[in-house]
């Protein structure tokens, strides 16, 4: 344990906070071929693979996910929320942060109802989260 004198001479350093979604905090300068710091809430990307994954231990399901190459050339795994989707290889999607707790390596969500992703059909509640238009009366 340090003495007060030692702490006065060299104070404690606080830990730097790590980002939960690091791929959204990078931009890519294609002229210089180098990364820049550029925080963004969402990024556009192209699906390179669409498939299913099994969750961690107590849960059992086939969770839909897509491998996405973002506009900054970083490849990530992104979860496809909701029931049913129209995504396939080369679909252009919008990606936001937010991990899926029972899927290791999935730290991003695809935004439903944006770009090539359709909204969830027949959804009546929480429609804005799933990109569903208001039903006609």
Curated annotation (Swiss-Prot):
Entry's Gene Ontology molecular function annotations: rRNA binding; structural constituent of ribosome; tRNA binding
Keyword Nucleotide-binding recorded: no
Keyword rRNA-binding in annotation: yes
Keyword field: Methylation, Ribonucleoprotein, Ribosomal protein, RNA-binding, rRNA-binding, tRNA-binding
Region of interest: Disordered: 1-28
Residues carrying 3-methylthioaspartic acid: 102
GO biological processes: translation
InterPro entries: NA-bd_OB-fold, Ribosomal_uS12, Ribosomal_uS12_bac
Pfam families: Ribosom_S12_S23
GO cellular component, one term: small ribosomal subunit
Similarity field: Belongs to the universal ribosomal protein uS12 family.
Stated role: With S4 and S5 plays an important role in translational accuracy. Interacts with and stabilizes bases of the 16S rRNA that are involved in tRNA selection in the A site and with the mRNA backbone. Located at the interface of the 30S and 50S subunits, it traverses the body of the 30S subunit contacting proteins on the other side and probably holding the rRNA structure together. The combined cluster of proteins S8, S12 and S17 appears to hold together the shoulder and platform of the 30S subunit.
UniProt subunit comment: Part of the 30S ribosomal subunit. Contacts proteins S8 and S17. May interact with IF1 in the 30S initiation complex.
Record-given protein name: Small ribosomal subunit protein uS12
Gene symbol of the encoding locus: rpsL
């Amino acid at each position: 344990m340090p003495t007060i004198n030692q702490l006065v001479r060299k104070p404690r350093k606080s830990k730097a906070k790590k980002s939960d979604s690091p791929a959204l905090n990078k931009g890519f300068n294609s002229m210089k071929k180098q990364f820049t710091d550029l925080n963004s809430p969402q990024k556009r990307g192209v699906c390179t693979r669409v498939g299913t994954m099994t969750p961690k231990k107590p849960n059992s399901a086939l969770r839909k996910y897509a491998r996405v190459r973002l506009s900054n050339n970083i490849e990530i795994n992104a979860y496809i929320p909701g029931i049913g989707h129209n995504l396939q290889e080369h679909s252009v999607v919008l990606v936001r942060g937010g991990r899926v707790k029972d899927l290791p390596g999935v730290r991003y969500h695809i935004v439903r109802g944006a770009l090539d992703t359709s909204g969830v059909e027949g959804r009546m509640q929480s429609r804005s989260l799933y990109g569903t238009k208001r039903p006609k009366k």
